[in-house]
Amino acid sequence: MLPARNRMTRSTEFDATVKHGTRMAQPDIVVHLRRGSEPDDESAGPRVGLVVGKAVGTAVQRHRVARRLRHVARPLLGELQPSDRLVIRALPGSRTVSSARLAQELQRCLRRMPAGSGR
């Protein structure tokens, strides 16, 4: 589970991260990262948001995918800068893959992001 201070909850945060952040795709997830987006909000630490649409499956399947994504995102909080905003969008294939593969894809995305990610 992600701590409350590290969760994105406002749609404006999601919109800004998706619109102005850098996108990296993998077979089962798409990651949007916006670095240094809100300098006055750094004390809260990095924030992570999930997008798991109906294309992923039934409500039970979507919630399962969301739980697994939260679980794999939590250890990566230490690698992010305090002002970073991260949105993870689950693709339909994420419903059938293992948590280990989701973690591997997320780590691969974050490693390949340019240092100054964000527009």
Curated annotation (Swiss-Prot):
Coiled-coil region list? none
GO molecular function list: 3'-tRNA processing endoribonuclease activity; ribonuclease P activity; tRNA binding
Quote any Pfam family the record assigns: Ribonuclease_P
Domain of life, source organism:
Bacteria
What's one GO-annotated cellular component? ribonuclease P complex
Q: Which cysteines are joined by disulfide bonds?
A: none
Catalysed reaction(s)? Endonucleolytic cleavage of RNA, removing 5'-extranucleotides from tRNA precursor
The EC number(s) attached to this protein equal 3.1.26.5
What's one GO BP annotation on this UniProt entry? tRNA 5'-leader removal
Annotated signal sequence range: none
Q: Which UniProt key words apply to this protein?
A: Endonuclease, Hydrolase, Nuclease, RNA-binding, tRNA processing
Presence of the UniProt keyword NADP in the record: no
Top enzyme class of this protein?
hydrolase
Give the UniProt family note: Belongs to the RnpA family.
Q: Subunit structure, per the record?
A: Consists of a catalytic RNA component (M1 or rnpB) and a protein subunit.
Explain the purpose of this protein.
RNaseP catalyzes the removal of the 5'-leader sequence from pre-tRNA to produce the mature 5'-terminus. It can also cleave other RNA substrates such as 4.5S RNA. The protein component plays an auxiliary but essential role in vivo by binding to the 5'-leader sequence and broadening the substrate specificity of the ribozyme.
Q: What is this protein called?
A: Ribonuclease P protein component
